[in-house]
Amino acid sequence: WLGSQAKEFKAYLLRNDTVCFSYKDKDYHINIVGADIFPQGFSAIAKNLFMFKGANMLADIGNGTINIMHIIDQKPDVNTCSTEKFGTEQCVIRINEKIMQTFHTSIHENVITEVLRFGIADIAEKYLNIIVEEAREYTKEILERLKIHDYDAETMKLYIVGGGGCLIKNFGEYDKSRVFINDDIHATAKGYEYLAE
């Protein structure tokens, strides 16, 4: 996406020099002087790019997608940017389908999300066991999908950002010396502030 649509998207963002709008009974007038386009997830690691020596993969696991990019010797390789429609929402749907097949009932997605984020929720053990089992399987599939994009756990470091990092952290089997999970929910915003300086 970045390579093929970045110029068009930047032109779209810069189509107006000034934007005027009202929000909560206050008028705003903004002068747009430029726009920078970055790969998804990049802002969350931009400040620490100096740490990305050798071969690395960045995976931004969001609600609907996983955005992937290689970073080689501190240089993002935008030619390796790709997106997999395999985010946390698909995991929640899969879990609820399994619960429906097994117990002929469903669990509210907020309860499933609580288990995915924290590893536990106030539910019967039989439901918790299904959620954990499915989350472990889904996490294995995430790591397999990264391999399709040339991730090699023995020769690369993996940096995970985004809310879906909790899946890997809580249910994944990985080498903690080679996989780094940034679970700061403000990492992207902090990164954009850093890039704007």
Describe each region flagged by the PLM.
Residues 86-109:
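Conserved ATP-utilizing enzyme core subdomain
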Residues 44, 71-74, 98-105:
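Short hydrophobic alpha-helical module
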Residues 1-56, 76-90, 110-197:
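Nucleotide/phosphate-binding catalytic cleft detector across ATP-hydrolyzing
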Residues 48-77, 95:
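Gly/Thr-rich phosphate-binding beta-strand-loop-beta motif of the actin/hexokinase/Hsp70
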